[in-house]
Regions:
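Start-transfer (signal-anchor) and selected internal transmembrane alpha helices
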Residues: 1-45, 242-246
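Membrane-interface starts of transmembrane alpha-helices
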Residues: 19, 23, 110-122, 144-152
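Membrane-water interface at transmembrane helix exits
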Residues: 35, 39, 70, 105, ...
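Membrane-interface coil-to-helix junctions
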Residues: 34-129, 158-159, 163, 168-173, ...
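Alpha-helical transmembrane segments of multipass membrane proteins
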Residues: 30-38, 159, 207, 250-255
Length: 286
């Protein structure tokens, strides 16, 4: 994962692009091996009996909403389906279908007539990128070497909040947060604000179409990057304002187009799914 616009992976001394690629591939391989140990091949391919009737309510919601969305007509907002809660319908962004992948799957279905369960490959992708993204962050802080790549992958793949998210599929995409942190530190430590700001801006907007929880964190990191940019990169306030305006306009446009502002919900679960002192350490039971 060499960021275009950077100087040989970062602005810091590097072992060379080949060594960087090898380190990233190794981190991704470790993640895929762990995924293969924890899940059967059919689960990772999105096929087999597991996906016919998952035991987890969240997964049932993901799958059923995705199927309704794929088989419905094209509408606006883009992710609106009237096959759920007719006649008004609902935007499936609220049903955790991973809107970006759902959009590609719907295009494929309309063109070919074949449905694709993208949740299985998504699990494999998240496991591959979990360690890779953490390595990207560590390299942004100056870490180099093959052994550190292995250590980074193992640490990232051992995080309880990641391992316990497999039943809430979209929140497996924690690599988005880690990559954004890596871009932030490359901007700050390497004094490459403009290049990294563009990449961080794009990542933040893409994350809207994956999960809004992740977007809130990724967008917060991007806001911090812009603040650093404004304070340190003198003479480029206009660029900072342009990037900020693009981010705000892009965010509003995506929220409207995807259906985040469509309809209204209730407060079911408020106060029940709450935060307490054990949650960061034992999130599945607190």
């Amino acid at each position: 994962m060499v960021v275009p616009g950077s100087q040989d992976d970062t602005a810091f001394p590097a072992q060379g692009r080949g060594a960087a690629v090898l380190a990233y591939l190794l981190a991704a391989l470790i993640g895929l091996i762990l995924a293969a140990v924890l899940f059967t091949p059919t689960v990772l391919l999105g096929t087999g009996p597991f996906w016919d009737a998952p035991n987890y309510p969240d997964m049932q919601q993901h799958l059923s909403a995705a199927r309704y969305f794929l088989h419905d007509s094209w509408r606006f907002p883009v992710f609106l389906t009237r096959l759920i809660m007719p006649p008004d319908g609902v935007s499936v962004v609220f049903l955790d279908v991973n809107p970006l992948l759902a959009l590609f799957a719907k295009i494929w279905f309309k063109l070919t007539g074949f449905t694709v369960n993208y949740f299985g490959p998504w699990i494999a992708l998240c496991y591959a990128l979990q360690g890779t993204a953490f390595l990207f962050l560590c390299r942004s802080l100056g870490l180099r070497g093959v052994v550190p790549a292995v250590v980074c992958a193992v640490i990232a793949l051992s995080v309880p909040e990641f391992l316990y998210r497999y039943f809430h599929l979209n929140l497996l995409g924690q690599f988005l947060i880690t990559i954004q942190l890596g871009l932030y530190f490359r901007a700050v430590r390497g004094d490459r604000y403009r290049a990294m700001s563009w990449w961080a801006l794009g990542l933040a907007l893409i994350t809207i179409l994956i999960h809004f929880y992740l977007f809130a964190i990724v967008a917060g990191i991007y806001a911090a990057l812009l603040a650093e940019y404004a304070l340190r990169a003198r003479g480029e306030i206009r660029t900072v304002l342009v990037h900020g305006a693009i981010f705000v306009i892009g965010t509003i446009a995506l929220l409207v187009a995807s259906g985040y502002l469509h309809g209204a919900g209730g407060s079911t679960g408020f106060g029940y799914f709450s935060m307490n002192i054990l949650s960061p350490f034992v999130p599945q039971d607190s």
